[in-house]
Amino acid sequence: MKLLTLCSAIGLTVALDCRPEGPVLPKPANLGDAASFRHAAVGLAHTFDAMSAGKVDVPWPVENVSFSVAVVSADQEDGTPLWQYHHRANANVNGTEKVDADSQYLVGSISKMITSYILLVAGMELDVPVTKYLPRLNSSKEMEWDSITLRMLASQTAGVPTNYGFSDYYFLKDVYLALGFPPIDDSEYPPCGVIGLNEGCTAQQLETGLRDSYPVIAPGSRPAYSNAAFALIALAVEAHTGMNYTQQVEELLSKPFGLTATRPSPGNDSKAVIPPGQSSWGADYGINAPQGGLVSSIADLSKLAHAILSRTAALSPAQTRQWLKPSSYAGSMSSSVGMPWEIRRYANLTVDNPHPVTVYSKGGGAQQYRSQFSLVDEYGLGIVVLTAGDMHALTYIYDAVLSVLVSAADKVTRKHAKAEYARQFSNRGSQTPNSTVMVEFTLDDDSLILSAMSRGSSDILEGWIKVFSESLGMFGPKISGTVRLFPTELNEKVTLDGEVVTKEVWRLWPDLVAPTAVDLPGSGLANGDCLGWTLGDWIHYGGEPLDRVIFYRKGSHVASFEVPFLRSGMMKVSS
């Protein structure tokens, strides 16, 4: 039996309470106009005002910490933050006298995300050995350079050393001796990049030094953080394009996006947020700029976040979605690593309606500077936090923004879904006898639910569940009586009744029943797996998938609905 063969290929073994990755509901539109979101942002601003005035107990000297925060929405026209907050530390004596969206900060390893973007738009082969572009690496005795690709370098899975030269802390030489380490000659240190001993590395010195260094891990085995990998990426892009890193940033990033502040350090002192005391501001990072030596601003990073969220960057929408994916696990149940995203799945961001929310981030740091660039793609939300001063402040400020405003965005999203999607649709008035189709959706604490679907006097929802249960349920977990639906991001502009509307394809998703516990070792162990995604698109009726439905939206308002497998035609709101 063909169906038996196909379902066996799925490998269904367990029943699960799970949902597809990605948006649970349509991303919020006009988020900045929502009163509840504005109220949350105002409350957060008051909290930061109190914190900066020393009225909130925090583990850092508030008089030394400047910071800027921006929140960006995908549906904005130009990437201008829908909310921003800036504070200049009272102890600052140098740099700008007013911190705003155009003020410059060192952004540390956010540079890696920018270097990865440059790599993606440079038109290079990502899955060939890096030695295609940097042949000097070929003659290594220690590293398997012919097994290391550009994608592995950008995804932190190449096993390349963290640094070359920089990790030898020459200024601690006497400390090592006092601790009982054996004395060594200066000649035993790397010939470049050792602060306090020698000059920064040239491209040739870096490649030669890394060629002969020890690998950190076997290539491709797991993530191992590397700064040097991104210097190699920039050198490979230079070999391919003829542009040095400064030119790459200007031509492939700043000009296309209209950025004015993003460049390799040193930046512009008059626009800089410079903390009191010693810091990395003004440093020339040289060949290390691609890994952590860029300066930027809230205005620039907001534009970049908007372009990624709105799929308007130089990458195609499919390439952008693929970029925002993990490439390896990071050692915990909730963390993974991308290219070079630091990806975290939060279970508690939306307290009123808990569900896993994935945040794609890149953090950065330099002496007295820390930064965070995060995308909450499910809500089309970008968060940028830049700090100058005590480096502990960033985590607390970022967590406050993330927890307050993602929860606020979720509430706006659910309110909109309840008003526009959780409704009844029908094609009453059909000329064909007994062919009136009625569909009704409700919204529970998790998602939209298909609560009723009929054609004439037939209960199609009951029949739908029966078809899925009898054809697929026997090979895996039982199908429950709850059928959910989720957006697919397959949206397009079409003309309906002479008007341009947005066609949204959704997929139905049956909840699965957990198997009965039995008195055997390991019973229930597989319940944490999520195999619901394997059921999609399995059953068709005359070429139309039984799980595919379509909403048609005019602006932010749902105008009509269609069930192609019922040949319903356009259905209007009936309640």
List where the protein language model places each region.
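Fungal secretory targeting signals
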Residues: 1-15
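Catalytic loop of the DD-peptidase/beta-lactamase superfamily, centered on the K-T-G motif
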Residues: 16-89, 102, 283-575
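Active-site-proximal loop and beta-strand segments within enzyme catalytic domains
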Residues: 22-31, 61-63, 73, 83-226, ...
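Non-transmembrane alpha-helical segments in soluble domains
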Residues: 45, 49, 120, 131, ...
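"… SH3/SAM/PH, and C2H2 zinc fingers" -> "… SH3/SAM/PH, FHA domains, and C2H2 zinc fingers"
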Residues: 100, 105, 133-136, 215-217, ...
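Well-ordered alpha-helical segments within folded domains of soluble proteins
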Residues: 113-116, 229-234, 302
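Bacterial peptidoglycan biogenesis and beta-lactam-recognition machinery
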Residues: 121-125, 238-246, 255-262, 307-315
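Long, well-ordered core segments of solenoidal/helical folds
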Residues: 253-263, 323-331
